[in-house]
UniProtKB/Swiss-Prot annotation:
InterPro entries: Ankyrin_rpt, Ankyrin_rpt-contain_sf. Pfam families: Ank_2. ANK repeats lie at residues 82-117, 118-146, 147-176, 178-206, 207-236, 238-266. This is Putative ankyrin repeat protein R602.
Length: 304
């Protein structure tokens, strides 16, 4: 399995790509054109009909969707553009009522859509939508293990707890690939997903204590506390990690870690000291400059 950074890049590429489906212009003549289509279908060309379909998705016009779609002769045109577009809009509005999107997708499935099109694209995007849409896709053949467990990786990385739970219920191993799910959830502080993963047995120390050390790297106070309270080992914090906290001057983070038992004196063994700069500092000390003053100049000196 790829590293967390590679999976994160893969997720970013996927979500960046699906954003190209959103470029639909506002229509001021939508209802008039739909009425014309219903009364005189021969007067409306297929491209216009398809554009009306996409616009009906934007404005959640399910009745209009049903009226329009029966007049189009290729609803799976342009590499399944319509279903991809519905899923994209559902993803953008995942926190809202999904019933209209659900019915639109169900119509396409009942019409004959192969939900596994384009290497199971539908379940990948559905994992970012409301769990009811994800369940609809799964119930109609979507592969929960598609592309090396990519659906649960997407759901975890975007904090879709209900979708993570559904995928686990459907047989996905939540601890796959050295606990990649909990690692991805921790990146943007989706604490509910992290807490759920811990509750079902995920190893908070997996990947050389990835969750805690990534939180330290980002000076993420809440995730640091969550990870430690969930059992993350303080002993895995390296001198280089401590150096990072000192470099970015975060006394709050330092105090929290010390309270939990971190021995910050291990920073004396840091391996990231640059030889040329060490030589310069050693030269200052040999000429009588107090090492404490050097530290103050580095971290506490006022600007001119």
């Amino acid at each position: 399995m790829d590293s967390v950074s590679k999976i994160s890049r893969k997720i970013n590429l996927f979500t960046k790509h699906i954003g190209t489906y959103s470029k639909i212009n506002t229509s001021t003549t939508y209802y008039a054109t739909v009425k014309l289509l219903v009364n005189n279908p021969c007067n409306i060309d297929q491209d216009t009909i398809f554009n009306l379909l996409e616009y009906s998705v934007i404005i959640l016009d399910l009745d209009g969707f049903y009226q329009i779609i029966k007049h189009h002769n290729d609803i799976f045109r342009d590499n399944y553009r319509l279903i991809r577009y519905i899923l994209y809009i559902a993803y953008q509005n995942h926190h809202q009522d999904c019933s209209v999107y659900y019915e639109m997708i169900k119509y396409l499935i009942d019409y004959g859509l192969d939900i596994t099109f384009n290497d199971n694209f539908a379940i990948k995007l559905a994992s970012l939508c409301h769990e009811n849409i994800l369940k609809l896709v799964i119930d109609n053949g979507g592969d929960v293990h598609a592309d090396n467990e990519f659906p649960i990786c997407l759901a975890a990385n975007h904090g879709r707890l209900s979708c993570v739970k559904l995928l686990v219920d459907c047989g996905v191993d939540p601890f796959c690939f050295d606990n990649i799910v909990i690692k991805l959830a921790s990146i943007d502080y989706y604490d509910n997903v992290v807490e759920y993963m811990v509750s079902i047995g995920a190893d908070i120390n997996a990947g050389n204590n990835y969750v805690l050390r990534y939180a330290i790297k980002n000076l993420d106070k809440k995730m640091i506390e969550l990870a430690i309270n969930a059992g993350a080992s303080i002993n895995d914090i390296s001198p280089n990690d401590i150096t990072h906290i000192i470099k970015y001057q975060s006394p709050t983070i330092m105090n929290i870690l010390v309270e939990y038992g971190l021995d910050i004196s291990t920073v004396n063994f840091c391996s990231k000291i640059r030889p040329e700069r060490k030589k310069f500092v050693d030269n200052l000390i040999s000429r009588g400059v107090d090492p404490t003053i050097i530290a103050y100049l580095s971290y506490a000196c006022e600007s001119d």
